[in-house]
């Protein structure tokens, strides 16, 4: 490979396959334009199942929220130096997925990312602001320069996806409830990632600087202000209960299990109350 060939590292973890497709769509125009892209799929030491088991799904949240991830296998990264790094991730309990956090906490990652321009590519249900704030902190710890963030969210509305996304993760069926829209990101939105990959390609091949203006005016990440309050409230709940559950686990695994069962029942009760009320309020307002 010639020294003048531009190189991009794309790191991702995909449990359902959706994020892998999003990452491929971003990488394709780069590869077609002659940019060398190393795509690295992170592998947990103990694989996460898909579909999830009910218990393991919920038991994952305390460590996820507190950035104490399960270990990953050492990723096979072919080169030591890249012109840019793309980190594609999904959101677990309003935090980056554990394998991504584990990658960013490796000493080898710090050496790799130090001083490098980084783009984050998020595929999630609809709430991502809290996860991205944690991502910013992790990147800053590694000395990386965050220059852009691209976000693709589920196609159906917030109330519906509150039900359809967990149903998909626990059953493996995107349309488990036939009366509700399909879970996941729309095909057109997944394909739209190529538009941003093409912009990075053009910037690299023109030897221009990769900075915060890279995806300016491209609609890379749209903030839904209506969700900010709900996300903050849920984030506080996850954080406090996560800390309590981890402390309980140090005393007794049975105590952690009992408290987690109580919290799950609390969450289900909230869903059964808040989702219908939310739908009713929206209908009345319209």
Model-derived segments and their meaning:
Residues 1-89, 94-99, 105, 109, ...:
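N-terminal beta1-alpha1-beta2 submodule of the flavodoxin-like/Rossmannoid cofactor-binding fold
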Residues 61-62, 138-145, 165-177:
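A polyampholytic, Gly/Pro-enriched intrinsically disordered region
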Residues 27, 104, 132-136:
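Short amphipathic alpha-helical segments and helix-helix/interface helices
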Residues 89, 125, 184:
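Second-shell loop/turn segments in exported
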Residues 49-54, 132-133, 158-164:
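Short aromatic-enriched loop/helix-cap "lid" or pocket-rim segments at secondary-structure transitions
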Residues 96, 131-135, 189-192, 196:
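Internal, well-ordered alpha-helical segments in soluble enzyme and binding-protein domains
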Residues 117-160:
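Short, glycine-/small-residue-rich phosphate/pyrophosphate-handling segment
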Residues 157-234:
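Glycine-rich phosphate/pyrophosphate-binding loop and the adjoining helix
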């Amino acid at each position: 490979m010639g020294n003048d060939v531009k190189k991009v590292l794309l790191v991702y973890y995909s449990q359902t396959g959706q994020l892998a497709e999003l990452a491929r769509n971003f990488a394709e125009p780069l590869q077609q334009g002659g940019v060398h892209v190393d795509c690295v799929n992170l592998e947990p030491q103990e694989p996460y199942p898909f579909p999830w088991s009910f218990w393991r799904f919920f038991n994952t949240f305390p460590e996820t929220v507190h950035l104490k991830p399960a270990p990953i296998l050492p990723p096979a990264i072919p080169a030591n130096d890249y012109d840019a790094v793309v980190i594609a991730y999904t959101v677990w309990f309003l935090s980056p997925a554990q394998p991504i956090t584990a990658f960013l906490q490796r000493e080898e990652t710090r050496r790799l990312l130090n001083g490098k321009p980084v783009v984050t590519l998020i595929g999630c249900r609809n709430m991502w602001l809290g996860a991205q704030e944690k991502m910013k902190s992790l990147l800053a710890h590694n000395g990386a320069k965050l220059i852009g963030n691209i976000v693709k969210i589920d196609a159906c509305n917030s109330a519906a996806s509150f039900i359809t996304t967990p149903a998909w993760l626990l059953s493996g069926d995107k349309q488990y409830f036939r009366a509700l829209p399909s879970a996941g990101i729309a095909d057109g939105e997944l394909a739209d990632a190529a538009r941003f990959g093409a912009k990075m390609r053009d910037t690299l091949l023109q030897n221009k600087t990769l900075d915060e203006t890279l995806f300016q005016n491209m609609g890379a990440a749209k903030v839904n202000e209506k969700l900010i309050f709900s996300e903050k409230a849920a984030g506080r709940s996850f954080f406090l209960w996560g800390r309590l559950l981890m402390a309980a686990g140090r005393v007794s695994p049975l105590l952690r299990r009992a408290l987690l069962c109580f919290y799950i029942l609390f969450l289900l009760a909230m869903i059964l109350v808040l989702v219908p009320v939310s739908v009713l309020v929206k209908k009345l307002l319209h």
